[in-house]
């Protein structure tokens, strides 16, 4: 998915305009939650998300979503990760 398609998807799903988020190479965040739902488009690098014991990798062009208060862990690839994220 490209940025224009992602912006359109956000609008359809009732999300506000996204912000750019950058995470460091080989970084990680252990299990945590957010008090909001997230929809994000990976634009550079890679991120692995672990939810309910299942890990999935996301690379440029991939979209990931997290539900409100969904417990998850994050790990970032050797080039870190940059993504556009919107929350509601």
Report residues per predicted region.
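N-terminal acidic leader/helix
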Residues: 8-15
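Conserved short histidine dyad/triad with adjacent acidic residue
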Residues: 16-34, 67-69
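Short, surface-exposed secondary-structure edge patches
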Residues: 30, 39, 54-57
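Short acidic-glycine-tyrosine-enriched beta hairpin
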Residues: 52-69
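Fe(II)/2-oxoglutarate oxygenase catalytic core
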Residues: 1-2
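Short, conserved beta-strand element in jelly-roll/cupin
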Residues: 33-49
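Ligand-binding loop in jelly-roll beta-barrel domains
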Residues: 68-88
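A generic "binding-loop/recognition-motif" signal
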Residues: 25, 35, 54, 70-71, ...
